Amino acid sequence: MRISSLHTYPVKGCHRLDHDAARVEPWGLAGDRRWMIVDPDGVGITQRQAPVLTGLHAVPRPGGLVLNGFDVAEPEDGPKETLRVFSAKPPLTARLAPAATAFVSDFLGRPARLAWLADTSVRPIATHAQPGDRVSFADGYPLLLTSTASLDAVNDWLLEAGDEPVPMTRFRPNVVITGAPAWAEDDWLGHRIRLGGTTFRAAKSCSRCVVTTVDQETGEVGRQPLRALGRHRRYDAGLLFGINLIPDIAPGETEVIRVGESSLALS
């Protein structure tokens, strides 16, 4: 098994960045979802509500990022705000970037603000984690791993149903592996996985939502692959595709993983 691709999403819900190599921090890949657009109530806005976010291209730079050509500095002295990634999630404190308010509001066509997670220690992982595990603005876990063979299985179901196959981008993974049998990742839960020279804990399966129906290049919304997952991959935990990982590295440490490196499920 090998790593076939690596991806980050600098702003939650935005278009992906593809990488040949990525630095692993305790809370995920470097630069992944440290920013989030929120509504006036401080709740995150994602592609669930705003598929237009597929057209938001965010590129990190030292001390900030560039959004579709609009430069935003990290608001180190920006106002602190109590936010929620989802309305039902616990609150956390992050800083707002007032200079970006007009830009993100115009982009979405609704009132919105841009938040930056300066301190990753403020958001603990709720379940299937160890004390001290933290996550950025990702849904719940630092990384999502998917398998090309499992995608092939989904696309076989789609073709049988008379639908077009979908690319892996629909599932917005961080790490994609090749060389494992379809659904082998189901058996890795509760174990450790080594990607290159870095070890991760396989925390839980990933329950999928309507974002999988959003074309990540056009923002158009359809019905698949969520309908196929509902028919073939429905479990008590939801409609499952991919697994959530937690880096098994100490606070303050970083490591690097690269496309082409081997991957191995450990005992």
Model region roles, listed by residue range:
Residues 1-267:
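Metal-cofactor-dependent catalytic cores
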